[in-house]
């Protein structure tokens, strides 16, 4: 009966007995455990890429307001909001596969990791495992294979952060205390990065 199946299903969910997947030919819980590390590692890297790129671009766009640099960054952010991420990923994959020797279809180079210089994968976080093994080539290889997908995942977030940071900076740079700082003879860099940027980052950090 349906209600018995449903109760059995709920019991399995609670006890992490999620059955067997014929797609990957292993237990679902084991498949999730293996892939969760890869997903989390990629998500963290994408977050780092988005923040490290978008905040400086947003600040730079605000101090170059209505100039060609500002227009270029705003156009870049607009594309990030408008372009479907899956299409952008396919485009980059096609471009790098066709015009470079950058192999990005796997998490790592199997020849390096499994044949020429295998290391023990304990956590399935490849960056952490390569650091634990003290192997710089493995770390570089894992990072190289993650940069492109991390950039794709970060692009949409970058667009939002850039626009938010730019708007916050423009608001802050128009405040009275900024004009007072300028009247005291502080340089543009001091005004922007010491007085303006920290206050403009508060709403941005809240969003993150």
Give the residues covered by each predicted segment.
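An internal, D/E-rich "acidic patch" concept
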Residues: 1-55
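Short, hydrophobic secondary-structure boundary micro-motifs
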Residues: 3-4, 19-22, 88-89, 104-106, ...
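Short amphipathic alpha-helical coupling elements at transmembrane boundaries
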Residues: 8, 12, 30-34, 74-78, ...
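Membrane-water interface segments at the C-terminal ends of transmembrane alpha-helices
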Residues: 11, 77-129, 152-158
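Alpha-helical transmembrane segments of integral membrane proteins
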Residues: 36-69, 85, 117-208
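Hydrophobic alpha-helical membrane segments of integral membrane proteins
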Residues: 69-72, 89
């Amino acid at each position: 009966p349906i209600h018995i199946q449903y109760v059995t299903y709920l019991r399995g969910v609670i006890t992490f007995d999620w059955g067997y997947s014929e797609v990957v030919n292993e237990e679902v819980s084991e498949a999730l455990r293996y892939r969760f590390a890869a997903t989390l590692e990629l998500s963290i890297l994408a977050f780092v890429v988005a923040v490290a790129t978008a905040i400086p671009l947003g600040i730079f766009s605000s101090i170059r307001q209505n100039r060609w640099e500002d227009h270029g960054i705003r156009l870049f952010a607009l594309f990030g909001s408008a372009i479907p991420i899956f299409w952008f990923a396919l485009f980059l994959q096609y471009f790098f596969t066709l015009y470079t020797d950058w192999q990005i279809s796997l998490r790592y180079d199997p020849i390096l990791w499994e044949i020429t210089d295998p290391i023990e994968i304990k956590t399935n976080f490849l960056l952490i495992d390569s650091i634990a093994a003290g192997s710089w080539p493995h770390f570089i290889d894992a990072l190289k294979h993650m940069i492109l997908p991390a950039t794709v995942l970060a692009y949409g977030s970058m667009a939002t952060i850039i626009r938010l940071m730019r708007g916050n900076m423009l608001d802050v740079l128009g405040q009275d205390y900024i004009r007072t700082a300028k009247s005291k003879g502080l340089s543009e860099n001091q005004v922007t990065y010491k007085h303006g940027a920290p206050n403009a980052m508060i709403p941005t950090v809240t969003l993150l």
